[in-house]
Amino acid sequence: MEELIAKRYAKALMESCSEKELQAIEDALVAIAALFRDWKVKEFIISPEVEKSAKEEILLAPFKDAGKKFVHLIKLLAEKDRLEIIPALANELKIQRALKERKFDGVVYSEFKLSDNELKKIAEALSKKVNGEVVLHQGKEPYDGIKVEVNTVGIEIEFSKSKIKKQLIENILKAI
């Protein structure tokens, strides 16, 4: 439900803001969304016992340079009791901007570190596929094989040792 509401707000922002304003709003929303990872902060922000004006002040205080539209957005979200959608809105705005600019970020997970040249080759191949620019980064989580994710366009390519081993066993059993 939050994602659907966030899409509407993101669409409105995309239509009414300049690129510079969008960048400032996205940066501020991403920073606020990071606060939501702390359950105490999230509980405070979604609490009906806390005055809306107090929530607005706390959320707006660090972002004096984010612009009028950001201030209006936070006030509107507070007024409509929708501050809890900020993480979804930050994510949706990031996706919408990436789709508009045709610039996508992705992550490569593997049990070994890939060279910059290897990452670049994979990114170039994916860039042709999505008709845009793909920038890949090495993920920090180890993976039994290799996995490439570009979430904004829904790409997930994976080759794992366990999956290949399972397919080999299935093929051997079929051949018998």
Swiss-Prot record:
<keyword id="KW-0813">Transport</keyword>
<dbReference type="GO" id="GO:0046933">
    <property type="term" value="F:proton-transporting ATP synthase activity, rotational mechanism"/>
</dbReference>
<comment type="function">
    <text>This protein is part of the stalk that links CF(0) to CF(1). It either transmits conformational changes from CF(0) to CF(1) or is implicated in proton conduction.</text>
</comment>
<dbReference type="InterPro" id="IPR026015">
    <property type="entry name" value="ATP_synth_OSCP/delta_N_sf"/>
</dbReference>
<keyword id="KW-0139">CF(1)</keyword>
<comment type="similarity">
    <text>Belongs to the ATPase delta chain family.</text>
</comment>
<keyword id="KW-0997">Cell inner membrane</keyword>
<keyword id="KW-0472">Membrane</keyword>
<keyword id="KW-0375">Hydrogen ion transport</keyword>
<keyword id="KW-0066">ATP synthesis</keyword>
<comment type="function">
    <text>F(1)F(0) ATP synthase produces ATP from ADP in the presence of a proton or sodium gradient. F-type ATPases consist of two structural domains, F(1) containing the extramembraneous catalytic core and F(0) containing the membrane proton channel, linked together by a central stalk and a peripheral stalk. During catalysis, ATP synthesis in the catalytic domain of F(1) is coupled via a rotary mechanism of the central stalk subunits to proton translocation.</text>
</comment>
<dbReference type="InterPro" id="IPR000711">
    <property type="entry name" value="ATPase_OSCP/dsu"/>
</dbReference>
<dbReference type="GO" id="GO:0005886">
    <property type="term" value="C:plasma membrane"/>
</dbReference>
<keyword id="KW-1003">Cell membrane</keyword>
<dbReference type="GO" id="GO:0045259">
    <property type="term" value="C:proton-transporting ATP synthase complex"/>
</dbReference>
<protein>
    <recommendedName>
        <fullName>ATP synthase subunit delta</fullName>
    </recommendedName>
</protein>
<comment type="subunit">
    <text>F-type ATPases have 2 components, F(1) - the catalytic core - and F(0) - the membrane proton channel. F(1) has five subunits: alpha(3), beta(3), gamma(1), delta(1), epsilon(1). F(0) has three main subunits: a(1), b(2) and c(10-14). The alpha and beta chains form an alternating ring which encloses part of the gamma chain. F(1) is attached to F(0) by a central stalk formed by the gamma and epsilon chains, while a peripheral stalk is formed by the delta and b chains.</text>
</comment>
<keyword id="KW-0406">Ion transport</keyword>
<dbReference type="Pfam" id="PF00213">
    <property type="entry name" value="OSCP"/>
</dbReference>
